[in-house]
């Protein structure tokens, strides 16, 4: 599971890589030291805009104009690179990379995400934004799509209409008031989500962390998949009709808070040492205590060593041969380390699949 989560973070990073190599530089705008420089460019209302720096805070907002405007106090030059490969450069750009040259490096400019600068940018509300920084926070609001990646900073995304993908290694991720397909991954930080709904019936919601907590509040997407290694996983809000929810945790607790009239089918795999605590009246469809019985029958194999007690005095070398038996016992017990529970609440409209290997699962009423 850990490898999968790190792989997911790596995938999110790859998505943010700058694409294309065809250069179409517009004229250069330079600023004096201490002066905030600003630059604009006409673009298609649904343009794809990429902004990337090595370090710095990035703030991106959508507006009603069909142009992008970039401002920075830390850069002396802002450069727009068209990568739409159009033959007619008089038409508004459909794909643009925003490049910055920081103060002190004008004589030896560093392109391709090497600038150290804080940046503010406005883009058309229908645009898709790709923002990336190694050390810094990212804020994106009011656009059609958002791809965001930060190694050590926090990511905040609001009011996105169609899709969101965000990944952070050491920072937290917050998503509010958005719709569409969602994929969020953080290795060391937590993930908080508020008011997210699908834009189409095929939209999915996926979130994963390694050590950070996951909090999902009022997520109405019908297909939800949340995974964490050691964080606490919490979901609060009504279930989508005929929704499918998957929750996996290695060592953290799970808390699912739902309305009192929630209707769902529960498919759970939980550790024998932990339990499911429910405020809801559950109708169990199988007997959870049955699986642990086979190990009790397997234990008498130890009797086979008693007749050999007389042999032990003659052959003390037999001791090491017993060791593999100790190793072999977990192989018999392992299949029953998790209890499989199937239960129904109400008419079972939604499906909740839970896998908890070391924490308690709580089903609470709002």
Where are these regions (language model features)?
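Intrinsically disordered, low-complexity terminal regions
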Residues: 1-366
């Amino acid at each position: 599971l850990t490898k999968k989560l790190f792989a997911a973070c790596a995938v999110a990073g790859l998505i943010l890589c700058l694409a294309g190599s065809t250069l179409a530089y517009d004229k250069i705008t330079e600023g004096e030291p201490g002066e905030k420089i600003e630059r604009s460019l006409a673009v298609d209302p649904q343009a794809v805009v990429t902004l990337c720096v090595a370090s710095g805070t990035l703030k991106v907002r959508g507006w009603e104009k069909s142009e992008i405007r970039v401002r920075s106090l830390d850069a002396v030059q802002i450069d727009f690179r068209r990568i739409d490969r159009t033959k007619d450069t008089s038409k508004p750009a459909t794909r643009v990379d925003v490049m910055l040259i920081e103060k002190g490096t004008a004589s030896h400019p560093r392109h391709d995400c090497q600038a150290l600068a804080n940046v503010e940018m406005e883009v058309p509300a229908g645009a898709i934004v790709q923002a990336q920084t190694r050390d810094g926070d990212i804020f994106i609001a009011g656009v059609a799509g958002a791809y965001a990646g930060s190694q050590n900073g926090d990511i905040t995304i609001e009011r996105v209409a169609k899709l969101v993908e965000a990944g952070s290694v050491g920072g937290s991720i917050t998503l509010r008031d958005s719709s569409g397909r969602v994929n969020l991954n953080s290795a060391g930080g937590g993930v908080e989500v508020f008011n997210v709904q699908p834009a189409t019936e095929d939209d999915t919601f996926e979130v994963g962390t390694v050590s950070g907590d996951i909090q999902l509040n009022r997520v109405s997407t019908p297909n939800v998949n949340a995974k964490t290694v050691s964080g606490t996983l919490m979901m609060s809000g009504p279930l989508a009709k005929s929704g499918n929810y998957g929750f996996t945790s290695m060592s953290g607790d799970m808390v699912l808070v739902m309305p009192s009239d929630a209707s769902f089918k529960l498919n759970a795999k939980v550790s024998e040492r932990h339990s499911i605590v429910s405020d809801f009246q559950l109708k169990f469809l199988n007997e959870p205590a049955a699986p642990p019985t086979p190990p009790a029958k397997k234990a008498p194999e130890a009797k086979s060593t008693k007749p050999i007690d007389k042999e032990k005095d003659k052959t003390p070398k037999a001791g090491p041969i017993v060791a593999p038996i100790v190793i072999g016992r977990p192989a018999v017990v392992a299949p029953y380390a998790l209890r499989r529970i199937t239960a129904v609440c109400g008419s079972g409209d939604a499906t909740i699949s839970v896998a908890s290997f070391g924490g308690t699962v709580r089903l609470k009423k709002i």
